[in-house]
A protein has these predicted regions:
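Patatin-like phospholipase
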Residues: 1-285
Length: 285
């Protein structure tokens, strides 16, 4: 069936003894041996035994080339789409000069040899949303963000910046704290440019807060729905841990600022909760 398809197919294997990378296409794989080459290409040594073909032992092609963009270019591709699953092996620089998109996940996809069906289904859903995001069909960084409703994200971003500025006026170190939270959790800066998902920076604090309280990631959200789900996921108001920094009451500014510095993501989660509490209730209808 693969040989009869109009879609070209290729794979990479690695000679075990020499660690030489071998690029293979259907044209140079002998008839009847495709399954052998596929098994060799996926023999992830040392977890899986090397696979022998014609007296030569081979291991997973990813050891020397885990994203074979060059092979796709040689086979006639005019545009490349690579998938980075953060696996073992060597990722070679892309020297093809072709338009290229790399799809990768914000989330930990689990151990390499975890074959749990529930996790697999979740990872498939995450991969779909990562792809949709890369092609500009969804926004966000970690979550799949659907088109906005009633300018909720714009209003959230404006209120968040206002509350952040107010907190910084009480403790100037919070400017760095907020930036570190984004950096630690791999979220973009507030006004970073991104052509495929231009709203990523604005909604990043809400996504970060949602991640911190384990909002499910395998379904898409509108900004409003993500906010509502975040609030529903909180047993207690995260903002209660920083009442002084957030201007809710008088207290120990230095102590709360030190706590925020120690756990930047926790402070941003509190700030998001505080921000949402300041938004008009009509925005959540």
């Amino acid at each position: 069936a693969i040989r009869a398809s109009h879609i070209k197919y290729g794979l990479v294997i690695t000679e075990m003894n020499t660690l030489r990378s071998v690029q293979c296409t259907l044209d140079n794989i002998p008839q009847g041996q495709l399954k052998d080459y596929m098994l060799a290409s996926s023999a992830c040594f040392p977890a899986l035994r090397p696979y022998e073909i014609a007296g030569v032992k081979y291991i997973d092609g990813g050891w020397r080339d885990n994203m074979p963009l060059e092979l796709a270019a040689k086979m006639g591709a005019t545009e490349l789409i690579g998938v980075d699953v953060d696996g073992v092996g060597l990722t070679r620089p892309n020297l093809t000069g072709l338009p290229t998109r790399i799809i990768r996940s914000h989330w930990d996809l689990g151990p390499l040899f975890d074959f749990d069906g529930v996790r697999a289904a979740k990872n498939i859903a995450l991969g779909y949303m990562d792809t949709m995001r890369e092609f500009g069909r969804l926004g966000g960084t970690a979550y799949g963000i659907l088109p906005d409703e009633n300018s909720f994200m714009q209003d959230f971003a404006a209120e968040y910046q206002a509350q952040l500025s107010a907190a910084i006026s009480r403790a100037p170190t919070l400017a760095l704290t907020e930036a570190l939270a984004r950096q630690h959790k791999h979220y973009p800066a507030a006004f970073s440019e991104n052509l495929t998902a231009p709203t990523r920076g604005a909604i990043a604090p809400l996504e970060l807060a949602a991640e911190m309280v384990d909002v499910p990631s395998e379904v898409p959200y509108t900004p409003k729905l993500l906010a509502l789900t975040f609030m529903g996921q909180c047993d207690k108001d995260p903002a209660d841990r920083y009442k002084t920094l957030l201007g809710r009451e008088e207290g120990n500014i230095l102590g709360e600022a030190a706590m925020a510095t120690a756990v930047p993501e926790d402070f941003v989660t509190a700030l998001v909760s505080h921000t949402l509490s300041k938004m008009p209730s009509a925005k959540f209808l």
